[in-house]
Amino acid sequence: MERMMRILRAEVEGHIAAIAPAELDSYCDIETGLGQLFAEARPIAPVSVEPYKHFAKGVWMGLDTENGDCGATVSMKALHDGMGGNGRGVARLSVNPVFPMAVKPGWVTLETAVSLEALKRAAGLRIDTVSFFDIAAGNSAQIPRSVTLNLRLHRQGGKVTDHLNYRIPVSTMPFEHSARIGPAAMEELSLGDVTEALLILELPLAGTYTLKLDHFAVLALDEG
């Protein structure tokens, strides 16, 4: 599986570079906790995470602690030695939710901090992911083949608004996807009074599975 992933990743990166070099040049990185985690590609031993406590700088799990005893384990490992495209490390973040038998939780999320200054300067966004589900052989639950991406904005006065509600398709094989936010949609976010920005991946709420995330990057469309 890992060999197949390396081959697929190399083919995808080569394909993108070949067909759209100008488009890639028009984007620059926006710092996020998850992006930094993948850039460093440092291993994380399997750990049972505490809700809303960082397991890496700027990265944490959101867990519904009011309904049942939902939990999650995370780990990270290098896929191979050396660096990936664009100077990035090559690593895999594994997120394994554990669900209560009786009560369905309201949410299980993977969350990351986003550089607010860079977000406010961006004319548009592109959010790149490579991910797949590893579903246990004995799983009997219906697991949606997607995760939902949201941008949560904390505003002055304590107001919080959620945006995007974008479904990222996730298969059982590594799949690359780009979510795009154009200039018009960026204007509608009204970022002037925003004090904090988070990107949130909402995971399926049932089943025996592990979300495998091999790449995460937020890119800003240059105004020029």
Model-derived features: where do they sit?
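Membrane-lipid interaction segments
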Residues: M76, P105, T109-T112
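Solvent-exposed strand-loop boundary residues in beta-sheet-rich modules
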Residues: L153-K159, L205, D222
